From Swiss-Prot:
It is an enzyme of class 2 (transferase). Belongs to the galactose-1-phosphate uridylyltransferase type 2 family. It catalyses: alpha-D-galactose 1-phosphate + UDP-alpha-D-glucose = alpha-D-glucose 1-phosphate + UDP-alpha-D-galactose. It is found in: Cytoplasm. GO terms for molecular function: UDP-glucose:hexose-1-phosphate uridylyltransferase activity. PANTHER family: DUF4922 DOMAIN-CONTAINING PROTEIN, GALACTOSE-1-PHOSPHATE URIDYLYLTRANSFERASE. GO terms for cellular component: cytoplasm. InterPro entries: GalP_uridyl_Trfase_II, GalP_uridyl_Trfase_II_CS, GalP_Utransf_C, GalP_Utransf_N. Keywords: Carbohydrate metabolism, Cytoplasm, Galactose metabolism, Nucleotidyltransferase, Transferase. The keyword Nucleotidyltransferase applies. Its EC number is 2.7.7.12. This is Galactose-1-phosphate uridylyltransferase.
């Protein structure tokens, strides 16, 4: 069948266009791809595959240049044909929400996959596996989904005149944005508007999802990330308004924060993270908040879990803990609230509903540096940075490692080294590879070697999280943790 005809047939069946629109749609496609595609045939069946073939034909016809950016821009323009306009998407969402919030969310999720905003084909390239640990099973992913720019595009991006539009990748102005070499194409992007604590916010999915239904809740205004009482109010409002989803925030300080600190936002989704399954290892009640169940969970980072029927009680207690942590120091365990007025303490908060109750996990963070640990005292230390050196953000805090693409080949290379097929590994992996070889000197089976290396990556990720934990998993560390809890105020009843 002719490629353009087949694509247009799919567009008509997947959108509000009708058969009468066929000629119009064909001309829309030809204007973007080139009339030389008219005779091209296809044996593909899926809409996104047909779109990809049209993009490659546009490159062949020299309608667009042979670059990742040009491909992305054309691809999103073609998929915009199956995407209703923003007002219609919002109208459909809220009409469905009135009958079933779950159905409204599901419909928007399906649209975001159907129109290739969520890059399912790219996400499928990621490597993902689980590893056992003292803290339960952890999740390891090697992130291969994001396409890497080639050197020509990187050079071109440096020459592009600076633009403040959109101000960042999370601004509402991204909806329908054409794209350029240093800003992603978002023609097929749609955002659900909703009111939260008296302000307009947006709800969208993450194009390169790290977990099931990975979504972003973003401030309608371009305002910097800030953890405050409002953060707890908003997170609990989200889990109430979007049933089945958790919601969490990155911390708001360098080193312990996420990659985007310039635009206030939260992340969420329908995924049970390892941290959610972590049991309480110590329980108590805070004075004045006796109705709130509280405790420290068994986790490599320092986490207080609060559970209650009352959102108001949770918000008030979380804010009290946060305010106390911001000014709390304990020199006996290298915890310092500030240096010369520069704050070191913040929180990574996560909210969910469980068994009808609201739950908040408060992860204590400290971004101090030292001569011994210039990248951060509570950051992956030098000896584990060959696996993970980036900030430990919200997703990793919860037990899902997001590791760089280089590790795919490097893990295989270390496995080859263990069985004698390779004589060298990357310099920064040499010590690790030699250590594994000394532990397994007689390995000959490549598959077994690969399993050993992958398990070792998991064990190193545990160390990464332990490095980021402010109170260590030692008698001294846990006693210090309880001193902070007592400072907040424990109920003696």
């Amino acid at each position: 069948m002719i490629l353009v005809d087949k694509f247009v047939t799919h567009v008509i069946s997947e959108s509000s266009f009708e058969e009468m629109d066929r000629i119009y749609l064909t001309n829309r496609v030809l204007a973007r791809v080139g009339e030389g595609v008219l005779e091209v045939e296809t044996n593909l069946d899926k809409l996104i595959d047909l779109k990809d073939q049209l993009v490659e034909e546009a490159v062949r016809l020299e309608t667009i240049e042979d670059s990742q950016t040009a491909r992305e821009i054309l691809g999103t323009e073609l998929m915009d044909l199956v995407t209703p306009c923003p007002s219609q998407v919002n109208r459909d969402f809220w009409e469905a929400y009135a009958y079933s919030p779950e159905q409204a969310i599901e419909d928007f999720y399906q649209l975001s996959q159907k129109n290739d905003y969520i890059k399912l084909k790219a996400i499928a390239k990621n490597i993902a596996y689980r590893v056992p640990s003292d803290y339960g099973e952890l999740e390891i992913t090697i992130n291969l989904s994001k396409p890497e720019k080639d050197p020509k595009e990187i050079a071109a991006a440096k020459l592009v005149q600076a633009s403040n539009y959109p101000q960042c990748q999370l601004c509402l102005e991204n909806e329908g944005y054409h794209g350029r070499v240093n800003h992603p194409a978002r023609t097929n992007h749609r955002i659900i508007r909703f009111e939260m604590v008296g302000q307009e916010w947006g709800f969208q999915y993450s194009p390169y999802a790290y977990f099931n239904e990975h979504c972003i809740f973003l401030d309608g205004q371009h305002r910097p990330m800030a953890i405050s009482r409002q953060s707890f109010e908003r997170l609990l409002a989200i889990v109430e308004q979007f049933p089945g989803y958790f919601a969490g925030s990155n911390a708001d300080l360098p080193i312990v924060g996420g990659s985007i600190l310039t635009h206030d936002h939260y992340q969420g989704g329908r995924h049970v993270f390892p941290m959610e399954l972590a049991p309480l290892q110590k329980t108590f009640r805070f004075a004045g908040f006796e109705q709130v169940k509280a405790g420290i969970i068994k986790w490599p980072m320092s986490v207080l879990r609060l559970t209650s029927d009352s959102k108001e009680d949770l918000i008030n207690l979380a804010d009290k803990i946060f305010q106390e942590w911001r000014q709390y120091s304990d020199s006996s365990v290298q915890i310092l609230a500030e240096t010369d007025g520069t704050p070191h303490h913040t929180i990574t908060p996560i909210a969910r509903k469980r068994d009808g109750q609201f739950e908040l996990d408060l992860v204590l963070r400290d971004n101090q540096t030292s001569a011994e640990h210039p990248d951060g005292i509570y950051h992956p230390h030098k000896d584990v940075q060959h696996i993970k050196k980036e900030n430990i953000g919200l997703i990793e805090v919860m037990g899902l490692a997001i590791l760089p693409p280089r590790l795919k080949e490097e893990v295989e290379q270390v496995a080859s080294y263990l069985v004698g097929e390779a004589v060298t590994v990357a310099d920064y992996h040499q010590e690790w590879a030699d250590q594994l070889k000394s532990q397994h000197p007689d390995l000959t089976d490549k598959e077994k070697a690969l399993a050993i290396v992958k398990d070792s990556v998991g064990a190193i990720f545990v160390r990464v999280l332990e490095d980021a934990g402010v109170y260590k998993q030692t008698e001294q560390g846990q006693a210090a943790f309880m001193r902070f809890v007592e400072q907040v105020g424990i109920s003696l009843d």
